[in-house]
């Protein structure tokens, strides 16, 4: 798995791959992928890092663990592969985006366009068993993704951290540099979206901050395929 990181994340995370927790995690994953259906595909596990090099990170949207239905997860938080129905949380994200910036709701939930503009779509756990949410929680991924968050926190350029829901907000302790901008709201899930996710306007707030700090705003519109 080490050779998967081909960009500037590789030297930054090199030490993590040698640590005892990761060696143990890798053994666990080998067995899981061999004996069960695990999402995403093995070659998609690190896509958040692959599509958004460290130097390019301007925004972080933290998710929990990958979608656990067939053909959904592909390594970017909240995103689904083209041709797959929009999960309810993602539909709510698009509804808020429509209210916030007037973007139309697209016919797909493939968020690669965001990743390529510097939006790090990071789950805190990078794998899951089919049909079993949180099944790979506590197996070691949290150490790895905490390190990713710490590395982004070390960036000199201000970064926007979008933390939806309690699970993501628990990572706030890792964001210690005051020049970063933290946006918090309830999770976009149907269970909590009406409690303050709708109307929170994270996309316009992010773009206003990026422009204030001299960077290009994000083009949030995901186009129809």
From Swiss-Prot:
A cellular component annotation (GO) from this entry: cytoplasm
Compartments reported by the entry: Cytoplasm
Database matches in NCBIfam families: PRK05254.1-1 (NF003588), PRK05254.1-2 (NF003589), PRK05254.1-4 (NF003591), PRK05254.1-5 (NF003592), ung (TIGR00628)
GO MF: uracil DNA N-glycosylase activity
Organism placement in taxonomy: Bacteria, Bacillati, Bacillota, Bacilli, Bacillales
Main localization category: cytoplasm
Family: Belongs to the uracil-DNA glycosylase (UDG) superfamily. UNG family.
Highest taxon in the source lineage: Bacteria
GO process terms (BP): base-excision repair, AP site formation via deaminated base removal
Reaction equations catalysed: Hydrolyzes single-stranded DNA or mismatched double-stranded DNA and polynucleotides, releasing free uracil
Entries under Gene3D superfamilies matching the protein: Uracil-DNA glycosylase-like domain
Function noted in UniProt: Excises uracil residues from the DNA which can arise as a result of misincorporation of dUMP residues by DNA polymerase or due to deamination of cytosine.
Gene designation per UniProt: ung
UniProt EC number: 3.2.2.27
CDD domains associated with the record: UDG-F1-like
Active site, renumbered: 65 (proton acceptor)
Name of the featured protein: Uracil-DNA glycosylase
Presence of keyword Hydrolase: yes
Keywords annotated in UniProt: Cytoplasm, DNA damage, DNA repair, Hydrolase
């Amino acid at each position: 798995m080490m050779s998967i990181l081909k960009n500037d994340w590789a030297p930054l995370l090199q030490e993590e791959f040698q640590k005892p927790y990761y060696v143990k995690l890798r053994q666990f994953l080998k067995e899981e992928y061999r004996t069960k259906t695990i999402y995403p595909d093995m070659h998609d596990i690190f896509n958040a890092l692959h599509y958004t090099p460290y130097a390019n990170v301007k925004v972080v949207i933290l998710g929990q663990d990958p979608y656990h239905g067939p053909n959904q997860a592909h390594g970017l938080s909240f995103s689904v592969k083209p041709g797959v129905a929009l999960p309810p949380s993602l539909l709510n994200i698009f509804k808020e985006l429509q209210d916030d910036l007037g973007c139309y709701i697209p016919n797909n939930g493939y968020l690669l366009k965001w990743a390529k503009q510097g939006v790090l779509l990071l789950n805190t756990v990078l794998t899951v068993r089919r049909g079993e949410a949180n099944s790979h929680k506590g197996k070691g991924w949290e150490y790895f993704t905490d390190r990713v968050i710490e590395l982004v926190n070390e960036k000199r350029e201000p970064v926007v951290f979008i933390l939806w829901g309690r699970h993501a907000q628990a990572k706030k302790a890792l964001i210690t540099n005051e020049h970063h901008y933290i946006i918090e709201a309830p999770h976009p899930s149907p269970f909590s979206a009406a409690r303050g996710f709708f109307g929170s306007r994270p996309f316009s707030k992010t773009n206003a901050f990026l422009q204030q700090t001299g960077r290009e705003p994000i083009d949030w519109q995901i186009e129809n395929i």
